[in-house]
Amino acid sequence: MERITVTLGERSYPITIAAGLFNEPASFLPLKSGDQVMLVTNETLAPLYLDKVRGVLERAGVNVDSVILPDGEQYKSLTVLDTVFTALLKKPHGRDTTLVALGGGVIGDLTGFAAASYQRGVRFIQVPTTLLSQVDSSVGGKTAVNHPLGKNMIGAFYQPASVVVDLDCLKTLPARELASGLAEVIKYGIILDADFFTWLEGNLDALLRLDGPAMAYCIRRCCELKAEVVAADEREAGLRALLNLGHTFGHAIEAEMGYGNWLHGEAVAAGIVMAARASERLGQFSSADTQRIIALLERAGLPVNGPCEMSAQDYLPHMLRDKKVLAGELRLVLPLTIGKSEVRGGVSHEVVLSAIADCQQA
């Protein structure tokens, strides 16, 4: 069992990583006998894990209710959020309740925002079941729902009480979802850790076949990097913005194409290549490094071009609603070398449009 701490003073919390955690009541820190829980999951995961997690919590003396939501990015909405509030109020659950998010990024983000909002804040625990949520979205306290005009536009910074990463969940993950998570994994190497990127080049095949030791190391390293960044910059005033490499372009794809048509990691993968192309055009990133990124993304089964249905101009309205925009000026996360990146303002629309055009599908 691996345990990593996200260090935030009194709000510090553990990330527990191992196989078989759903069999151990002690995994679900800080729950104890007599606590009340609302377990939030979706229609796809409920048949796989709901009874197992409910059973282990009930054996520990925890009182468990549950709400099952529809599955998909398109349901990360205010309407579905209200379903969680209604379930909490009907029981009823008070301020001493704990929400448990059993699912991927959609369930984690939505449940976290419900916890931040319900009765002005209740405790919640992240139990991520996808690679993407295990390495990224479950750690750091970003919670949100989408708006038709933009992704994650309605939300809050609200840290979980703990994160429980059961590696066995990856055995039921569809191949497309595994690839989507690998986009965020590869991102960490590009922005923060050149050695990790090189390790990924040598071990990607092992990850694709769900090799246990390789996957455990991969998830641990990503969580270590994320925990370090969050501890240094919880509310994204500077360093944490680097974690958004590819996301300004990627969120534009998700919003324009309709939430759920492109998986988040797929859109981010294409966005990473667009960011690399923009950095190339600014003379600060080598074409050789861009090709290394493209090669690794393609080996993971990820797109390296944007959707053919979108023109370069279609991206800009969405990008200008990005949360990093200041005083109407676009700010992009751009790679400088493999393992180092920056947030750069003042990038001309011409450079942005040219970078997107470089990545248009035929």
UniProtKB/Swiss-Prot annotation:
Give EC number(s), comma-separated.
Answer: 4.2.3.4
Question: Where would you find this protein in the cell?
Answer: Cytoplasm
Q: What class of enzyme is it?
A: lyase
Query: Which of this chain's residues are annotated to bind Zn(2+)?
Result: 184, 247, 264
Listed cofactors: NAD(+); Co(2+); Zn(2+)
Q: Which UniProt keywords apply?
A: Amino-acid biosynthesis, Aromatic amino acid biosynthesis, Cobalt, Cytoplasm, Lyase, Metal-binding, NAD, Nucleotide-binding, Zinc
Q: Which domain of life is it from?
A: Bacteria
Binding of NAD(+), residues: 71-76, 105-109, 129-130, 142, 151, 169-172
Quote a single Gene Ontology cellular component term. cytoplasm
UniProt entry tagged with the keyword Iron-sulfur = no
**GO MF terms on file?**
3-dehydroquinate synthase activity; metal ion binding; nucleotide binding
Catalysed reaction, written as an equation: 7-phospho-2-dehydro-3-deoxy-D-arabino-heptonate = 3-dehydroquinate + phosphate
Instruction: Report whether Ligase shows up as a keyword of the record.
Output: no
- What stretch or stretches form a coiled coil here? none
Per UniProt, the cofactor note for this protein states: Binds 1 divalent metal cation per subunit. Can use either Co(2+) or Zn(2+).
* Protein function: Catalyzes the conversion of 3-deoxy-D-arabino-heptulosonate 7-phosphate (DAHP) to dehydroquinate (DHQ).
Q: Which NCBIfam families match?
A: aroB
Q: What's this protein's family per the entry?
A: Belongs to the sugar phosphate cyclases superfamily. Dehydroquinate synthase family.
What's the name of the protein? 3-dehydroquinate synthase
Q: Which organism is it from?
A: Salmonella typhi
Its taxonomic path starts at:
Bacteria, Pseudomonadati, Pseudomonadota, Gammaproteobacteria, Enterobacterales
The gene it comes from is aroB
